Amino acid sequence: ASIMDDWAKQFGLTETQKGEIFGVGLWPFAISIVLFSLIVDKIGYGLAMAFAFVCHVGYMVIVIAAPNIAGADPKTGYWVLYIGSFVGALGNGTVEAVINPVVATMFNKEKTKWLNILHAGWPGGLVLGGVLALALGDLDWRFKVGLVGIPVLGYGLLMV
């Protein structure tokens, strides 16, 4: 939430706008997980993960560039953050649509065990990300957004 507070100050966001940006970080996740779950076997895991990679990199570029794109216009700043968060959420849902069948296929004799381990890792990552963001304290919010690049680079290298 500290990044959101920084965004609110820099872009003059209202409480409603903050809520809308938080919300757009969620509902596109649901859309992409459903849509990609329906087509992932047809298009392949690699193409789906490439889409997710582009979305995650796009999120970082759009959001980090928001001050340059928006200038002094708070309305533009809101929309840049909104669009960036939308794109990032599409990537998140796509990863989820891919990782479940991949794990179930790789560990077909112990699916439940490994899917549970996988999903236990998500809150661990959220906690780790939160601790890192807090540890970075007053460091510019753009560096905190840049933390997303660590796992994105990781899975990007795995795809190569």
What is the predicted function of each stretch?
Residues 78, 82-120:
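Cytoplasmic helix-loop-helix junction between adjacent transmembrane helices
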Residues 109-110, 114-160:
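Helix-loop-helix hairpin linking two adjacent transmembrane segments in secondary transporters
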Residues 31-79:
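Conserved MFS/SLC helix-loop-helix module at the cytosolic interface between two early adjacent transmembrane helices
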Residues 26-34, 127:
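Residue-level signature of mid-helix packing/kink "hotspots" within the transmembrane helices
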Residues 53, 57-60, 66, 84-85, ...:
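A generic transmembrane-helix signature of 12-TM secondary carrier transporters
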Residues 13-22, 77, 81, 115:
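Juxtamembrane helix-start elements in MFS-like secondary transporters
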Residues 2-12, 102:
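Membrane-interface helix caps of multi-pass secondary transporters
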